[in-house]
Structure formats: structure tokens, C-alpha cells
């Protein structure tokens, strides 16, 4: 029962009817990705930058709540700098059928990567994960080539994150999902960056700091006063993001 409650806390999807119409302030394309072998079907949004030759793609994995209507709005942070943007909803989120599971999220990440690789070389794919999405992003980066990996408000593992948040006797019961980000990071052979705020009440700064040895001092960016949901409201975030994207 406790693990079932933990799972409901970890995964907080908002479902959408099949006929829901997405609306954004820039051009986009909606489509579904389907894996015939497993039957997994996930909803995706693609935002083209609309200019420049040899464009690159930001393959974005969002956090644990909401759906594409919320997360698609972040596309402008990247398209304004000439980067195409692809974001997916995990199983059970938005229009994606099914229930969210750890393996289902990893499988979804692979499906999105397959779509990207048909249109971009791996050197032009940037994997980006935010919060829970840092697990999917780091898992994918540990298994597939890309230009670089960027994580925003990541955690070392779900087990460790729970230990930071609840009494020890509850944490010792374990987590219903693992999402071992620190384990995946050690296996990523290309550049990795982390953005973390000092006032994050969901992923404590100390928790994210555990990932620093696998990223390096020069790519671990601390946003003073930044929380869990507002890093893109800080000029320092945008300044460093542009630098990282252009490296």
C-alpha cells in the first residue's frame, strides 16, 4: 500500500481527451510514436526552429506532472536560439495511453530517440532531462550516442531522493521505482551538464550535488535562489544554457 502511494506521488500525469487541440504561440507538429512489438503508443510534439542550416535537435524529457500542453511551452527557450525541439508524454500522460512505469518511460525515451535519429545524426542530438525526466535522459545517454546530455534539477536516484524527503524508517522500505540517475551518468561518454537551484524544495540542492563528481565543476551550474520550477526565469540559466548548447 505504501509503495502504491509512493508511485502515485512520483507519477502525477494529467490526462487529455483524444480530441484535445494543443495551442502554442509558435508552429508545431503533433504526432504519435508507436512500437509495434510492444504496442506502446506515445504522443509527441515537434517544434521546428524555422531557420538556419544543419539544425540540431533538443530531445526533451519532462518532469513528473502535467502533460504536453504545459511542457510544450518550454520549446521557445530553445527554438529562439535555432534548436529544434521534441518533447513526448510518457505512458498515462496526456494523450498517451497506458499507465506510467519505469520501464515504460525508458522505452518511450528510446522511441523518441529512434524518431530523432531518422532525421538528425547523433552528433546533432542534444538529450535534455528535467526533474523526473533526468532519469529517462541519463538512461538514454548511457545507451545511445548524442552530442551532449543536459539535466535540470536532477536527483541521484529515486531511493536517495526519498531518503532526503521522508523519515529514515520509511525510506528504508525502498522506492517502487529506482531511476538510478547517478548510475547512468557514470556510463555517459560525452559531455554532461547540470542546472540546479539552491532553493529547490523538491530535489534538495544537496541531493543534486551528489551528481557533481560525474559532471565536473565547470558543468555543474548553480542558480542562486532558484527553485524546482523556475530556473528559466533566471538570466544566469539562459546565459549558461546558450554557452552549453554552443559548445
Give, region by region, the residue ranges found by the protein language model.
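Membrane-embedded segments
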Residues: 37-115
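Primarily recognizes the serine-hydrolase "nucleophile elbow" in alpha/beta-hydrolase
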Residues: 115-118, 122-166
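Catalytic active-site module of serine/aspartate enzymes centered on a nucleophile-bearing elbow/loop
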Residues: 235-247
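Catalytic histidine-centered segment of alpha/beta-hydrolase-like enzymes
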Residues: 226-236
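An N-terminal hydrophobic leader/cap segment in hydrolases
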Residues: 1-34
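Short beta-strand/loop motif that positions the catalytic acidic residue
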Residues: 187-189, 194-196, 200
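Mobile cap/lid helix-loop segments that gate and shape the active-site cleft of serine hydrolases
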Residues: 154-184, 190
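Conserved alpha/beta-hydrolase "acid-adjacent" motif
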Residues: 201-207
Amino acid at each position: 500500500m505504501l509503495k502504491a502511494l509512493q508511485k502515485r506521488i512520483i507519477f502525477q500525469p494529467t490526462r487529455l481527451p483524444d480530441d484535445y487541440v494543443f495551442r502554442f504561440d509558435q508552429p508545431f507538429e503533433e504526432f504519435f510514436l508507436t512500437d509495434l512489438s510492444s504496442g506502446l503508443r506515445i504522443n509527441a510534439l515537434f517544434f521546428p526552429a524555422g531557420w538556419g542550416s544543419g539544425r540540431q535537435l533538443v530531445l526533451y524529457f519532462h518532469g513528473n506532472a502535467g502533460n504536453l500542453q504545459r511542457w510544450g511551452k518550454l520549446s521557445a527557450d530553445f527554438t529562439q536560439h535555432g534548436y529544434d525541439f521534441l518533447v513526448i508524454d510518457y505512458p498515462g500522460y496526456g494523450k498517451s495511453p497506458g499507465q506510467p512505469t519505469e520501464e515504460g518511460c525508458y522505452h518511450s525515451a528510446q522511441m523518441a530517440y529512434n524518431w530523432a535519429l531518422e532525421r538528425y545524426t547523433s552528433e546533432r542530438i542534444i538529450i535534455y532531462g528535467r526533474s523526473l525526466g533526468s532519469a529517462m535522459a541519463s538512461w538514454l545517454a548511457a545507451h545511445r550516442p548524442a552530442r551532449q546530455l543536459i539535466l535540470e534539477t536532477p536527483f541521484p536516484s529515486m531511493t536517495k531522493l526519498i531518503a532526503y524527503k521522508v523519515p529514515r524508517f520509511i525510506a528504508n522500505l525502498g522506492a517502487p521505482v529506482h531511476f538510478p540517475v547517478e548510475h547512468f551518468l557514470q556510463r555517459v561518454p560525452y559531455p554532461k551538464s547540470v542546472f540546479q537551484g539552491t532553493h529547490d524544495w523538491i530535489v534538495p540542492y544537496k541531493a543534486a550535488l551528489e551528481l557533481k563528481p560525474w559532471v565536473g565543476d565547470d558543468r555543474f551550474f548553480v542558480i542562486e535562489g532558484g527553485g524546482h520550477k523556475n530556473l528559466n526565469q533566471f538570466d544566469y540559466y539562459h546565459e549558461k544554457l546558450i554557452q552549453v548548447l554552443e559548445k
